[in-house]
């Protein structure tokens, strides 16, 4: 019977349910979109093989570090593809070796990666000669695209420039800008073998039996493309970032959906009261409300999943276009997409039903004699579950914040930790919103309008809370996360400036090149009257230091950012507390104090290609949030090219310094590099990092804030639409339409003020804890807030709320 009543109610009052249906559909679409993109990133994307599209079997070294413990075998993806061991190459004589290394025609435009290969591997793509002949001597090359046969050119390599002659061309393909050498010259330029290719199944089986190798066939051959490991690193980072963004978006969607459904039940209190009066039992009333919520939940969730299917590819395209993922990243719908959609669908229905459970139970327990009184004035009490849940979230958030600030300050810059703290505090404030609103709106209690505002809040705490929740979420998340990001970013940039603080100039590679050649570095060191240090950005795999508060991963090594230096000169400025950087060598390392290592201790680490090393600690550094906590000799950077050379002029005469600068510029110009003042370089790096952070924040907060804005409009419209009788009484009492609209606008602004005040308190806690943590970890760091953006978000929230509140009143209060 109550199912029939529920269906009839939906059919006859569909307009009243439109707001909740819209909020639910859009909320589920946000969850579906994020989960679909997250699933695609976690799956590694879908890419066809390029470099080895015509190779039957591709043999590579295992690109993962494997460890065995009582729980089984765990793997960690390596940061660089290791070479095929020489012993394996010797045991597979029938396979053809492929080498991929940096080789770029001087003056070639930046674009796809410039890579050199031996000519015998050209057929694996396949590349076929379109003119000329294959390289026959070490000074001959074949290039892709149009070129003048017989033309002498310069090829830039990691070892330095080479004078060669173009003797042939091949048709270009996507994925790289190839330069083909003789096999012997390729082996000289890059001794390591990146992959072996064979068409013999027996050879492939022997390779599989050797251990430590993987044999790739079919679509899996894309894992052997030269940029596959880097793509995997980018996708792993994207997966982590999307996980945070998905958690924030899901939190916002669930909170707004729950608020909208709770408001819809509160506004139908009169209907439910009448049902109790005519004899409906408490169980029947509660069942009817749950059934309505389930029906709306199913319809809204289905629509939301459909919208998610439409929006997920667009979001993936946006992510790829902003360089947050490989350029080829996309969402393709496969059987693996079903779980992501199922999660969104079930979440939507579950939230819809759960949102009305308390209201349905309260409506069902109302005695018939109290029903009509309950219909007029909402009860002011807050349910025990909501009270304890809100207090629990606040206690957990404050406790976590205190632990980070006082015990584990090095975790302050971690995005997962910051997001967890913010969500706990904002979630606690959302649950306690009905309790917080009245004291926060007391400043508006004067005058007739103020009396009406406070009376509206006091008699309708549920309605007021529903209006406050989206604003609280929008402003609270925006201020806390934007402020935390900008403050931590400023601390990281300060650490980077300190690293090159003693340098006068910085030598940088030309745009589109992966780094500086060792030949150029050697020429810079040969210039008199200057000190120089070549810095290489790299990573090392290591176990997390001692105890970490909020990372409970399995005891497997994880990547840590590091720099490799070729020498410790006066140009390198690192805050050494103990020991000396002069002792850095092939078997030593410098670490910051967050590693809790003592001078002379031996650390077990893994190089980016998985090579295990034991390095002795020769220097302890003061902690910095620049992201670099390890410093090694350049020999342990796995052949990566230096990203910069820090240069400091000697203390001699001005004429000698000028001569040194002129020589530096001339040497750099010959290699296509740039020389910039250190101050200008640090500013440029800061601008670049700010731009990258901005793109990340757009993804992290953009969807959530956009949905929150829709939630503000939806709940404000629903709230005003449910007050037609109250507004009509005001008109009968003599209020004009303009006065009614003004009162509604003032009430909306008062609620916005309450939400902003609560958000300010939350943000103050978050940023205060962050400031303490940064001060303990890296010294004094000022709090940085994007005031203009925060003002725009708060102002837009207020404007949306005001407009959505007065529009229904203007059309329903009669003529003025």
Model-derived features with residue positions:
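Membrane transport/envelope proteins' first extracytoplasmic loop
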Residues: 2-254, 263-266, 288, 503-504, ...
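Alpha-helical transmembrane segments
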Residues: 4-7, 11-12, 16-17, 21, ...
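Interfacial "coupling" helices/loops that link adjacent transmembrane helices in transporter permeases
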Residues: 5, 9, 13-16, 253-298, ...
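Alpha-helical transmembrane segments, especially those used as permease/efflux helices
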Residues: 15-19, 237-240, 253, 339-356, ...
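Short conserved beta-strand and strand-loop elements enriched in small hydrophobics
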Residues: 149-163, 599-615
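Short helix-loop junctions at transmembrane helix boundaries
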Residues: 305-339, 402-417, 758-796, 802, ...
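C-terminal membrane-exit region of the final transmembrane helix in multipass inner-membrane proteins
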Residues: 339-377, 790-816
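Juxtamembrane segments of multi-pass membrane proteins
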Residues: 423, 435-593, 602
